[in-house]
Structure formats: C-alpha cells, structure tokens
C-alpha cells in the first residue's frame, strides 16, 4: 500500500476568538484504516474518493443495492475486489459489514480544534455548535452521538483522551457515515479546553438531572458547546463546575435519564430549532 499522503493546504487565519495555549495536545485521533457497511464506505466514496484504496465486496450478493454501490465505486475509480462474507468479517472484525469493506487512507482534513474554529470564523459562522462528551466510553454510543451531531449540523464532537471511546470500525459503522463528516477531537484536559472555548466567547452549557432550568428555557443561540456526560454517571465534577450553566431534560416517566445519544439529540435539535 502506498504510504504517501496527499499534501493539504495549511490554514493561516487571524484568530478573532483569541489564541489559547497548548495547541499541540488537541489532535484528532486517526480515523480507521478499515471502514465497513454501505453508509460508512458510501460517505467516504462521496466526500473523498481518492482516499479509498480498495473496496472488497461479497460477490454472492447480486441485489440492486450492491450493484448500485459497486457502480458508484467504479465511477469513482476505486479498485473493486471480490470476496465473501467470512473473509470480510475477518477483515473488519464484525459480521455487520453488509458485504462491503474498504481500506482507506488515514486522513484528517481538520487537524486540530483550533484550526476548525479558525475556519468557522473565516467562513463567517456566527453560531458554531459543538457537542462535548464527558465519559462516553461505549463505541456504539459514540457512533450514535456522531450521527445525531451530523444530523443537527454540529461542527465537531469533543471528548477527553483518558475517558472516552476512540474512533474505530464499530464507531464508523454505527455512525453511518457521520464519522467521516463530523470532526472528533480527543483533548488532554477537558476542563481546560472548556475554559479555552469560553475565552473564545463560546458558552458551555452542561446537562444535569438536578438543574432547575430546562434545555427548553436556555438560550442556545450564538456560539454554544453542549456538554453531556455518560448515562447514569453524568459529567465529572470538574467538568460540571467549568460549565457556564447547567440545564436539565424534562423527564415525565419512571426512568431517571436518557441514553447519551438520545439526550444529545434532544439538546442539539433544540439548539437547531432556536436557530431557525
């Protein structure tokens, strides 16, 4: 496999939000070398076909969906290799591959959170929306959060390096392509990162079951980072203290909390509603 990586232009933009220190400790984790499933591979083919080295497909599948997929890959100039379900499962470590596995370049078009914010400022994005996850260690939950973040138009998802799931093939599969479209940044010190976001005039709004104000009473317009903890545990104490304000999601039934991906959807789409 060719190890050469395509060169990418460096962004040099005056940071009107301010320039926080310790830029080097906030890098995106490397995306997976293997993607599987129609959605994950299809999004990569659509957004960055040159980064797809080859696609392996189950030759026993002759349905319309597989034909359409392989036709799209051929049109993109991607090498297609016939395989079978068992071999594909061994390649990606999952039987949920749907007959499609791709080997892709490890690309990260936006290399740091600071670079992303600079690009948003340069593009005139007045209301950046970020999702911060504290303690979400389950890959399925992370994948679902990335998917809802993409749907709501969030510009990035942020998590602590020492207390979060990393991007892997399972995350990419559950995210249904959103792992390819939503930047995911793992930071060394989450509380410090939240403080730096606040220095950039991005309000950090955390969720807590005991907060009096509800998400529907909060002002989610303007630059906002929504901070959520894992189901049951919630945010860590320091993360909680660092937030500008805390809000709750109203619960009318017997259960006390929502799954973090569902809670993320409630909060992100309320922000989207307020920004219409």
Q: Positions of the model-derived regions?
A:
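N-terminal positively charged helical leader segments and presequences
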Residues: 1-121
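Hydrophobic, well-ordered secondary-structure scaffolds
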Residues: 26-27, 43, 136-139, 143-149, ...
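Structured adenosyl-cofactor binding patch, chiefly the S-adenosyl-L-methionine
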Residues: 42, 151, 166-178, 237-276
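RNA substrate-binding interface of SAM-dependent RNA methyltransferases
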Residues: 50, 57, 66, 79, ...
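Surface-exposed amphipathic alpha-helices with a cationic face
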Residues: 74, 194-198, 272
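Short beta->alpha connector loops at strand-helix junctions that form conserved
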Residues: 84, 105, 134, 160-161, ...
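Short basic, glycine-rich beta-strand/loop surfaces that mediate nucleic-acid
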Residues: 91-106, 178-179, 183, 187, ...
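Active-site/ligand-binding-proximal alpha/beta "capping" segment
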Residues: 205-259
